[in-house]
């Protein structure tokens, strides 16, 4: 895929900014850096923009320049609202972005964990993952969370991971760098958070069931909050 468009969503007044070491692991996506400011009840966008607009714009420009310095074309924008999930969805749909990055504290991009729920759009997801520079990559591991009430959950998960790994190999990822793990649990967010320990990036895929807050809200946000691991959501 030529230059996929990645939405980088940061929140003001204290945005989490991707580190230079982390950005070195990306291979030529286009970045749309969007700063979101949460408006309190009765607070107007005009008042906040008048008071802090220049400061926030300067910060966003500096973040975009950090991407540019690593060879990533970047644009930036500042939005205001009371619902960051709704604002994010609106931008995603308006600009038809290919992926969403929620920045965290990782200083490198050597170990990537991919949550794999099913094999839907596997080839597209694999091609999107090609934005990760393989020269920097040490491991790209796969995890599936099986339903404990499903007697065939684990075996089904193993099949999903095997097929996903095969697709990654087909697009050029080294087979020796791919590990597969099936976890069992009813709390998917918790299981993925536990699995994300020690990784530099957590990758989630959007599925039909996951549209809206399930992925663009609580699960991705939960993992980021618990582990401070950047989350990349593939569409």
Where is each model-derived feature located?
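N-terminal positively charged helical leader segments and presequences
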Residues: 40-58, 64-69
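Short beta->alpha junction loops
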Residues: 77-82, 179-186
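Charged helix-capping and loop-helix junction motifs
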Residues: 53, 158-162, 216-220
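Short, ordered loop/turn segments at secondary-structure junctions
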Residues: 37-41, 79-81, 104-106, 144-148, ...
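Helix-enriched interaction subdomains in cytosolic or periplasmic regions
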Residues: 1-5, 58-103
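Gly/Ser-rich helix-loop-strand patches that form or flank binding pockets
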Residues: 81-133, 196-235
């Amino acid at each position: 895929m030529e230059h996929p468009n990645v939405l980088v969503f940061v929140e003001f007044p204290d945005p989490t900014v991707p580190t230079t070491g982390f950005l070195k692991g990306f291979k030529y996506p286009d970045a749309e850096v969007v700063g979101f400011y949460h408006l309190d009840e009765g607070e107007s966008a005009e008042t906040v923009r008048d008071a802090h607009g220049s400061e926030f714009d300067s910060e966003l420009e500096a973040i975009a320049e950090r991407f540019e310095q690593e060879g990533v074309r970047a644009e930036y924008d500042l939005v205001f609202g009371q619902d960051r999930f709704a604002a994010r969805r609106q931008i995603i749909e308006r600009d038809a972005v290919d992926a969403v990055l929620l920045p965290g504290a990782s200083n490198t991009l050597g170990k990537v964990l991919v949550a794999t729920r099913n094999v839907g759009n596997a080839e597209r997801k694999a091609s999107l993952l090609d934005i990760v520079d393989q020269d920097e990559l040490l491991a790209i591991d796969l995890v599936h969370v099986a339903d404990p009430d499903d007697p065939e959950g684990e075996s089904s998960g193993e099949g999903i991971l095997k097929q996903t790994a095969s697709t990654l190999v087909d697009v050029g990822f080294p087979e020796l760098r791919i590990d597969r793990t099936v976890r069992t649990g009813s709390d998917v967010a918790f299981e993925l958070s536990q699995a994300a320990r020690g990784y530099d990036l957590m990758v989630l895929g959007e599925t039909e069931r996951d549209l809206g807050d399930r992925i663009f809200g609580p699960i991705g946000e939960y993992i980021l909050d618990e582990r401070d691991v950047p989350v990349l959501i593939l569409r």
